[in-house]
Amino acid sequence: MLSRTVFVPLILAFVGVSISAPVSNNNGTDNDESAADQRHIFTVQFNVGTPAPADGDSVTTDGKDSAEKNEAPGDSSDTTEKPGTTDGKDSAEQHGVTTDGKDEAEQHGVTTDGQDSAEKRGEADGAPDKPDTQNGTDDTDSDQETDASHHKTGDSDENKDKPSAEDHTDGNHAGKDSTDSKESPDTTDKPEGPDSDSAPDGDSASAEKTDSDHSPDEDANKSSTEADKDDTSDKDSSQTDEKHDSDASDKDEKHEDKDEKSDEKDSSKDSEDKSQEKSDKSDDGSNSEADEQKESVESKDHDSDSQDSDSAEKKEKHDDKDQDSSDSADSKDSDEDKDKDHSEQKDSEDHEHKEKHTKDKEEHKDSDEGKDDEDKSKSDEHDKDESESKEASKSDESEQEEKKDDKSDSDNSSRDSHSDSDSDSHSDSDSDSHSDSHSDSDSDSHSDSDSDSDSDSDSDSDSDSDSNSRDKDEKKDKSSESRDEDSSDSDSKSNSESSETAEEDTNDDKDSSVEKDKTDSSDSASVEANDSDDEHDDDSKDATPSSEDHTAEKTDEDSHDVSDDDDDIDAHDDEAGVEHGTDEASKPHQEPDHHDDTTHGSDDGRKTSMPIS
């Protein structure tokens, strides 16, 4: 893009200069004016955006009109007059034909050689702040234009005798040469700026720069050393007529040989130097001081730029091979710096964006982890609650089962105790009654005291019958209550089995009791049975209120503990033991469970068996 923006206005400027060259440079004396034109064009080409006018006179620095220069192209005195000159010298004097002009030219060239070289370099280079790629092409263009003008300058004496038409044809021919030589640097694009950077001092640097910049092809580069030699020899010698003759011969034979072309360019350079010196003299009369100061400042700036470019090229040769000057290197460095800064900014922005993205991801991950942890904690709590509720329900169920087992065990134990107490009390009462009756009968038979034996037997039988009746009533009540509880607890199977075993046990007890009764004497047994039956009826009446109280208490306390049953059983057993005088409560109870009331069966058995016996 940079090359496009540079070359498009350059091409337009070249076209404008090539059109205006034969018109404004007919006399060949406004060399400084053409250089100023091109310098002004390239300093304001980006601001104005339009090429210079066709005549090229609107941007002149001397303030003269173009009509004043182009009034009479055939008049040699008008064409050779420099703008701002007050001495009115003719062209021959200005070109050094007279000794005075020659001495002035030599003196001016010797005394102000460095200044003129610096001025010429400043004018040819144009604005020093532009890249040297532009300056190189500008120098070639300006030098080509000045070459064409100085071909006519060398023939200024001949132009006095020639008509204006011939001069115009010569100008057109020179314009064609300038366009031809102008197109060659555009196609080759040879870097020519660095030659001036390696110059050791001001004079040789200026001479080499002018030679290298004004030579568009290889032949001109070969003849640069010859040009230096010719410049020094021309300054030392006063043979100006030979130079003009060589200019004329070069103009006539400029397409014949390459050597002649190089000589022609060398002579044109010499005439350019002289015309430059003369223009400097004429400008000293009016405003040459300001121009010289500006040009000296520009030359100093250009020298400093050249020194800077040397160091820059040494540091950045591998990066700046295609660049022609330090200014272009600086511009490329600035572009590279901008690119680096832009890339660094992009990298920093990308890095910040990545950091933000990673932070957002981390925060999102943390939030997700927090949510997952919360969900996990909630699920764990929920599982714990469920497990606790399950455990609680299981514990409740186990407690209920244990309670049921305890109740069944308590019922079984109570039934066992009842059956044991029944069997024990029954057997004891039987044994006691039989033993007492037997002993009493024996004692009666021996002592013949029937009354005593009867009283003893009656007392013993009364006590035995009372205890038996109480135990029977209590057992009836407990057995009835235990039946109700067992039916509510849905333990029918175990109860039925236990009832079967209990019936078997009671049957065994019945058999044993019947056998025992049979072994006793029939008299004592019959008397005891009658007495016990009579007393049983009386005791049953007395025991009914106590049994009713028992049932009322147990219906009110359905959820009684096993310990209460055990206490009741122990209390009843203790009472029975106290009455009998034996430790029936301390006897082991290991018989199986039963639900049926065995007292009635046993009583019935006794009642039925006794009369039979």
Curated annotation (Swiss-Prot):
Residues 42-613 are annotated as: Disordered. One of its GO terms (cellular component) is extracellular region. Residues 450-465, 555-573 have a biased composition (Acidic residues). GO terms for biological process: detection of gravity; egg coat formation; otic placode formation; otolith mineralization; otolith morphogenesis. Keywords: Secreted, Signal. GO terms for molecular function: calcium ion binding. Coiled coil: none annotated. It is found in: Secreted. Residues 1-20 form the signal peptide. Residues 62-72, 117-132, 147-193, 206-284, 291-449, 467-482, 509-521, 538-554, 574-607 have a biased composition (Basic and acidic residues). Essential for the formation of otoliths in the inner ear of developing larvae and for the perception of gravity and acceleration. May be one of the organic components of the ortholiths. Otoliths are structures composed of proteins and calcium carbonate that are found in the fish inner ear in contact with the otic epithelium. They are essential for the perception of gravity and acceleration. This is Protein starmaker.
